[in-house]
Amino acid sequence: HYENFGPHCIPSCLVVTGDIDLSAHAQTLGMAGGPIPNNEPLARHILETGYADDIDWAFSKSLGVDHSVGVPYHMSLKKLPGVRIIPIYLNCVVAPFIRNRRAYQIGQSMLRAVQSWSGDERVVVFGTGGISHWVGGPGMGHVNV
């Protein structure tokens, strides 16, 4: 996403291990901005498990997020007490794209991380992006089918 990284630095795969903020894109999306709670310990565990699995994660200790995180959070999770998120990005936007096999390996590593996590949180994965959504317009929240 150019909104997150610009055209100058597009990571193949990235996990956000720190602060998450929607402020920069909130007005465009028509929603309240501000911080979004991150499950930092689990994010670091996913990162470290990935490194042990030879996943070459990039990581961000602070990231202003756009519609790809803000809309699902706002519509599904914001009103639930205690819910924390971990944004994870795979480059499917700018060539060279992450290879399917590598994306699968990352998913398997994430599964191992969650299964080996000592916490008692329930973990849900949201897949967002692609050409399946209207961003910042009157159709926001509806799937383009």
Ranges and model annotations:
Residues 1-145:
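Soluble secreted/lumenal catalytic domains
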